[in-house]
Swiss-Prot record:
Residues 311-335, 515-570 are annotated as: Disordered. Signal peptide: none annotated. Changing W602D: Abolishes interaction with eIF4E1. GO terms for molecular function: eukaryotic initiation factor 4E binding; RNA binding; translation initiation factor activity. SMART domains: KH. The lineage of its organism: Eukaryota, Metazoa, Ecdysozoa, Arthropoda, Hexapoda. Binds to eIF4E1 using a novel tripartite interface in the C-terminal domain comprising a canonical helix which engages the eIF4E1 dorsal surface, a non-canonical helix which engages the eIF4E1 lateral surface and an auxiliary helix that lies anti-parallel to the canonical helix on the eIF4E1 dorsal surface. The tripartite binding mode compromises its ability to compete with eIF4G1 for binding to eIF4E1 but once bound, the complex is very stable and is resistant to competition by eIF4G1. The gene is mxt. PROSITE patterns: KH_TYPE_1. Gene3D superfamilies: 1.25.40.180, K Homology domain, type 1. This is Eukaryotic translation initiation factor 4E-binding protein Mextli.
Length: 653
């Protein structure tokens, strides 16, 4: 008999689901949003500083940071930076129990590994099971009544007859810990949810402006590097005080202390800011921190100490308000001079203003005299301006407190009033630099423009073309037409072409008001005097921007244009603008022994350009040029006979 098998309906059997325990559901509900997590971090940080925290809140924080750590790192990195400074310090606090400190260490290592918690969880779980055997009552830890709170290592209980730790007791203690942690997680989450923003942790207490962040106990030398590093915390509101306008103030601190200061990027609304200081030595970093603290408290730039001979040495150009402090070498004081810088209330570290002013006047007078002896006529105007500036500066220094050892308190260039009471200009002459400093704007301006006009004149350019040097090594002196012996200098005469309306300047310098500051660059109102007022400045600009002549035609055209510009202004100056010699004078110079003296770079000329050497043997006088014979040959040359064309044909026939 055949049996037919009827098909049975197949049921979809679901896989067994894991049992839902109370701890797992509690932990699932304990995941916090980012705002609540930030509030929980602030609450835990405040509790750790006041030794009034609970292990449950730290457990909840650890559980959430394992999940939301990377997201919080990207959103609010400054919050984690401030909190982990406290976590590092609290992990070394012996008043906290072992369990709390282990969780803090796990948090620190978790962030150090970029929130990769694979190996970290297994390691700290084994350590936690050992430390939890001792006192299960530590979950209700109170800093005031905790027995053995100052113990740094756990003391294991000993059973009566065995003398070891029971594995069953350890498992039971671990289960009790998990249950207690799960029960307290929801309570900690509720506390964090209702927390207010006033409980936000602040590393800097009132009255303190800078503090060590805790990352380095002191300026630490980086292994394998040649520099030290330290990290401090300042208020974010004080960042502008340290930074200054366009970073000038922090650059001055870096220059004085020879360090590099880096500010941490923070989000808007951050209360504090981390600052890293890198320097070659520990004392330089400490000095930078002292300068930062002094700058924040005074809300002013640090005081720059300059040697007295360099007073007024830093100067700016005519069209720039920035100082050239970048060329000043940084000076870091030693221990004793550092104390002299910072102890402003010590009377023994100061000298009287009168003595300092006299000392400065003597040194400036000596420097001016030496400058006059070297350059003579070229720096006559500079000497007068420098003497007036030195006298004015010495007078202005009276009544101010100055430091000894030939040092003077200089004004900071990182503030808005960096040029108040002091005017500085620079005149460039080739590779050389002339600096003019004074307290009278008109006098300094006149000195600069007079020097610009002189160094762009035809006389000075002719001396440059003749090979005159400014380094003192050249023995050749170029001939020049001297200035008139009587009367004032030529550039002070009202009718001369110096490029400056001195009649306006002299009249306005008596009252020294602000209306005449732009007289030099103002458009002239009178058509007749416009040419004479603009000739000097126009010639100065042409000399700086014109191309050097390479052909006689171009040079002749330029000289003709200069003579046309100078016509009608001053015949004496126009005649002195160009120096020419006749052939007899040049032949007389050729017979001088100086014309046969070897130049200083003779060896270099032989190596680089041997083709230009005409006489190879200088000892052979027969091959030398004889001026007398050449002049006689010109005068006694035979006259050529001029013959007509028809006579030439007759001769040919």
């Amino acid at each position: 008999m055949a049996h037919t098998h009827l098909g049975r309906a197949v049921k979809n059997i679901e896989a067994p689901r894991p049992l839902k325990t109370q701890s797992r559901s509690s932990l699932k509900n304990s995941y916090l949003v980012i705002e609540e997590l930030i509030q929980l971090i602030d609450n835990v940080t405040v509790g750790l500083q006041s030794c009034n925290t609970t292990p449950e809140s730290i457990t909840l924080l650890l559980h959430n940071l394992r999940v939301h750590g990377p997201q919080l790192e990207a959103v609010s990195k400054d919050t984690l930076d401030r909190a982990f400074v406290v976590f590092r310090n609290a992990s070394q606090d012996e008043r906290l129990n072992i369990t709390t400190r282990l969780k803090l260490l796990e948090l620190i290592e978790l962030r150090a590994k970029s929130w990769d918690n694979d190996d970290t969880i297994a390691y700290y779980k084994s350590k936690q099971q050992i430390s939890n055997v001792e006192l299960p009552s530590e979950y209700q830890y109170d800093a005031g009544v905790q027995p053995g709170a100052f113990s740094t290592s756990p003391t294991f209980g000993v059973s009566g007859g065995v003398g070891g730790v029971n594995d069953g007791a350890a498992a039971a203690a671990a289960a009790v810990f998990n249950a207690a942690s799960a029960a307290a997680a929801a309570q900690a989450a509720a506390i964090a949810a209702v927390g207010t923003s006033n409980q936000q942790h602040m590393l800097l207490p009132p009255g303190e402006v800078i503090r060590n962040s805790g990352k380095f106990p002191k300026p630490t030398k980086i292994p394998g590097k040649t520099y030290c590093k330290d990290e401090v915390v300042i208020r974010n509101a004080d960042s502008g005080k340290v930074m200054g306008i366009k970073g000038r103030r922090v650059h001055m601190i870096e220059e004085l202390s020879e360090t590099i200061i880096s500010f941490q990027r923070v989000n808007p609304g951050a209360k504090e800011r981390l600052v890293q200081i890198t320097g070659p030595a520990e004392d330089k970093i400490n000095y930078a921190k002292q300068l930062m603290e002094d700058t924040i408290r005074r809300n002013a730039s640090p005081v720059r100490l300059e040697p007295a001979p360099a007073v007024g040495g830093s100067c700016s150009s005519l069209n720039s308000s920035n100082s050239d402090d970048a060329i000043v070498q940084p000076r870091t004081p030693t221990g004793s001079s550092l104390a002299n810088r910072l102890s402003f209330n010590s009377a023994q570290n100061f000298m009287t203003a009168t003595a300092a002013a006299q000392q400065i006047s003597q040194q400036m007078h000596h420097q001016t005299h030496h400058l006059q002896h070297q350059q003579q006529q070229q720096v006559a105007a500079v000497a007068a301006a420098a003497a007036a500036a030195a006298h004015a500066q010495a007078t202005a220094a009276a009544g101010k407190v100055l430091r000894p050892n030939q040092q003077l308190l200089m004004h900071s260039y990182s503030t808005n009033d960096a040029s108040v009471g002091e005017y500085k200009f620079t005149v460039n002459v080739g590779q050389h630099l002339i600096k003019i400093t004074g307290d009278c704007c008109e006098l300094v301006r006149v000195a600069k423009l007079v020097l610009d006009d002189y160094f762009s004149s035809s006389e000075f350019l002719a001396s440059i073309e003749a090979g005159a040097a400014f380094d003192g090594t050249s023995l050749v002196t170029t001939p020049s037409t001297p200035l008139p012996g009587a009367g004032p200098p030529q550039f002070w005469l009202p009718g001369t072409d110096s490029g400056i309306g001195l009649n306006c300047v002299v009249s306005s310098s008596a009252n020294n008001n602000g209306e005449g500051d732009d007289e030099v660059f103002a458009e002239p109102s009178n058509g007749g005097s416009s040419t004479s007022n603009q000739n000097g400045l126009a010639r100065s600009r042409r000399s700086h921007f014109s191309r050097k002549e390479s052909t006689p035609e171009t040079k002749g055209a330029r000289e003709k244009g200069d003579l046309d510009d100078l016509a009608g202004t001053n015949s004496l100056k126009s005649n002195a603008s160009r120096v020419s010699y006749d052939i007899e004078h040049l032949l007389y110079y050729s017979m001088s022994p100086h014309s046969w003296t070897l130049p200083t770079d003779w060896q270099k000329m032989q190596e680089t350009a041997p083709s230009i050497l005409r006489n190879k043997d200088l000892q052979d006088e027969s091959q030398r040029f004889d001026g007398d014979k050449y002049l006689a040959s010109i005068k006694t040359a035979a006259k050529r006979d001029i013959v007509a064309a028809d006579e030439v044909e007759t001769l040919d026939e």
